[in-house]
């Protein structure tokens, strides 16, 4: 059980990193470093941004649940 949660935690961490980097930059952040500042004016549907926000929040919730579950398993085993 703990091994499965650890694997899910690693995958969720990687996915969350990718999803956060995919967000449009609102300033001089990391996304504008890779050319996101130029593309943000040319493309970007609000539906895509909302879906990306939802997926990012879902992955963050999965990440938090895995951390809490692993802590509980470690505490009570």
Curated annotation (Swiss-Prot):
Keywords: Cell membrane, Membrane, Protein transport, Translocation, Transmembrane, Transmembrane helix, Transport. The keyword Cytoplasm does not apply. One of its GO terms (molecular function) is protein-transporting ATPase activity. It is found in: Cell membrane. One of its GO terms (cellular component) is plasma membrane. InterPro entries: SecG (IPR004692). Pfam families: SecG. Belongs to the SecG family. This is Protein-export membrane protein SecG. The gene is secG.
């Amino acid at each position: 059980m703990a091994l499965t949660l650890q694997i899910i935690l690693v995958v969720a961490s990687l996915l969350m990193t990718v999803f956060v980097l995919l967000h449009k930059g609102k300033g001089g952040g990391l996304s504008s470093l890779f050319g996101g500042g130029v593309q943000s004016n040319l493309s970007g549907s609000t539906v895509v941004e909302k879906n990306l926000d939802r997926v990012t929040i879902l992955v963050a919730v999965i990440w938090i649940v895995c951390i809490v579950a692993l802590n509980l398993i470690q505490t009570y085993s």
